[in-house]
Amino acid sequence: MSASFVPAMHDMRARRAHRAAVARTLLDGSLASAPEATTVEWRQLGELPEWCLWPADTRLRLLRVTGALFAAPGMRLWIDGRRIEIARTLIGTATLARVMACPALPIQAPAVPPAGDLQRLFDASGRAVLLGSLDAAWMRGVAGPSLPAADARTAPCPPAIARPLVGQALALIAEIPVEAA
């Protein structure tokens, strides 16, 4: 696992608190009766990224920024002002500007959807990337139900693409405060 995905916690108390929060999520969440929940060891609990436990609104922001980063190679070609305005509404003006300025990763951009489908594009792409960044099935089982549902055909993004995108998205949302829509 990449060091950037392990919670940046230096003291044992914080690490134990993180593991306990993950354990509560496993025991109380939708994964409680799943076989994956019974095979997770205490040491593994600390490997779940912190974003999986964030409040729903913060997690949704990460998801949409991640989806926008994934779609950015195609977005840079947009000339439709309506589509750009919808993207601004979904992730914020400053965030959109930063997404557009981020160096492009060598990925094929998703097809350009009609303007009304941008939320679905950002949500589905963000979900695929976030889930693709997770190493283990139990992690995807914890994170999956807390993310907006996607088309069943949407597969997780390959880890080599997903991890850098999630790292960029985490850096962006840490630098830019939540913007009013």
Each language-model region and where it sits:
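General marker for long, soluble alpha-helical cores
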Residues: 1-181
